[in-house]
């Protein structure tokens, strides 16, 4: 007889259902199940699936449904074709981005990201291309091929309209920006000029003397500033007379500013001038770099003044009241014999030749070396008449033009 064990109701196996949360993964056909949907299956205690108790539940019902990357890009204004971007994949819901230096910068939200992408899209449509950030490239040695490529790139950038625009903008920005070193250099010069203004009541002679005095003061001030910056001796000079001439002209301190034939008001025969650039400030000789100064008389060029300087390899000679003057040009002072060329009857040489026919006087300034060999003194020797000219071979074998001038009745100057 078989004994039947009685089972109490408390020990009876009950059918208990529970929800198993499966991890999220890609599903072949995910159109039926959303990205945040979780398939739940009810099982009994025997481990058998209960097909009658299968349903869909939300794992996190309070979270908003994430959008695909394609939909976000479409909202931003991009033309995204189906299947070309994103491939149906969803961006991760969380990204662990380390914040620099543990700052308080918060990551962008979805709405802020959409606005940012829309703004960048708008800028691309306006300017035609995306913004390119500049990178600092360290200098390194280039191979010949890379050097040619870099030179070609530099030429394209140099001639591009954007480069010209940037240079123009930079020049406009720096146009009114004062430079400190120029202000420091001219602070003393301007004070000298302000204290020594020319008066309208002065005679022509007084104006010439006053301008020459101011020229010397400004020259000395520039010479001291240059020696202080260089840390050297004050006796070293490098074309400071040209700088002084430029400053006085800019400040309107020039007298006898118009070219003329004959004598100049305020200047007497025998006047000594320390600098060649000062001859232009007082209107005696305007050609700072040239030895012959000329102007137009009608349709012809005639000479107004010449500067004869000894030691310039031109062979100028003075015999009593006669002067033999060598024409200009031909690179006579060049050490390269191949650079020496024949002089031509143009410019100042032609003006001296025309003065013979026009019978116009020429002012002659003689440059004499100082006793200390520190520069030259320029002495006004008076008016001369050009009598004739001719060609001859110079010491280097090139053709030179020689002019004979004779001094008219004027006070004698002792040299």
Swiss-Prot record:
Keyword Zinc-finger carried by entry: no
First and last residue of the signal peptide: none
Major location category of this protein: nucleus
PROSITE patterns: YDG (PS51015)
Compartments where found: Nucleus
Keyword Nucleus: yes
Cellular component aspect of the GO annotation: nucleus
One Pfam family this sequence matches: SAD_SRA
PANTHER family assigned to the protein according to its UniProt record, in alphabetical order: HISTONE-LYSINE N-METHYLTRANSFERASE SETMAR, YDG DOMAIN-CONTAINING PROTEIN
Protein name per Swiss-Prot or TrEMBL: YDG domain-containing protein At5g47160
Organism: Arabidopsis thaliana (Mouse-ear cress)
């Amino acid at each position: 007889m078989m004994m039947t064990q009685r089972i109490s109701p408390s020990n009876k196996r009950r059918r208990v259902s529970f929800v198993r949360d499966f991890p999220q993964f890609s599903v072949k056909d995910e159109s039926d199940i959303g990205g945040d949907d979780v398939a739940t299956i009810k099982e009994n205690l025997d481990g058998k699936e209960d097909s009658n108790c299968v349903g869909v539940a939300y794992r996190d019902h309070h979270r908003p449904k994430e959008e695909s990357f394609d939909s976000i890009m479409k909202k931003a204004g991009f033309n995204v074709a189906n299947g070309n971007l994103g491939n149906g994949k969803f961006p991760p819901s969380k990204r662990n981005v380390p914040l620099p230096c543990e700052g308080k910068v918060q990551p962008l939200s979805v709405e802020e990201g959409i606005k940012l992408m829309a703004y960048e899209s708008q800028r691309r449509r306006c300017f035609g291309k995306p913004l390119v950030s500049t990178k600092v490239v360290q200098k390194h040695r280039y191979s010949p091929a890379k050097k040619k490529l870099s030179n070609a790139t530099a030429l394209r950038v140099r001639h591009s309209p954007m480069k010209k625009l940037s240079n123009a903008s930079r020049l406009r920005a720096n146009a009114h920006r004062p430079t400190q070193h120029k202000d420091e250099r001219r602070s003393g010069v301007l004070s000298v000029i302000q204290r020594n203004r020319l008066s309208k009541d002065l005679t022509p002679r007084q104006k010439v003397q006053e301008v020459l005095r101011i020229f010397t003061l400004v020259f000395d001030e520039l010479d001291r500033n240059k020696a202080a910056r260089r840390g050297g001796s004050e006796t070293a000079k490098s074309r400071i007379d040209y700088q002084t001439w430029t400053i006085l002209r800019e400040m309107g301190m020039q007298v006898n500013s118009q070219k003329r034939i004959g004598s100049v008001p305020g200047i007497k025969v025998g006047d000594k001038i320390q600098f060649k650039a000062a001859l232009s400030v007082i209107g005696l000789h305007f050609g700072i770099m040239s030895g012959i100064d000329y102007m137009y008389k009608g349709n012809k060029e005639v000479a107004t003044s010449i500067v004869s300087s000894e030691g310039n390899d031109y062979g100028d000679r003075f015999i009593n009241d006669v002067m033999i003057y060598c024409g200009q040009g031909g690179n006579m002072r060049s050490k390269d014999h191949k650079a020496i060329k024949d002089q031509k009857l143009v410019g100042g040489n032609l003006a001296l030749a025309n003065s013979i026919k026009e019978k116009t006087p020429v002012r002659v300034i003689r440059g004499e070396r100082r006793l200390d060999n520190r520069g030259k003194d320029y002495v006004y020797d008076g008016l001369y008449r050009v009598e004739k000219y001719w060609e001859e071979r110079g010491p280097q074998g090139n053709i030179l033009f020689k002019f004979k001038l004779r001094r008219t009745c004027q006070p004698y100057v002792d040299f």
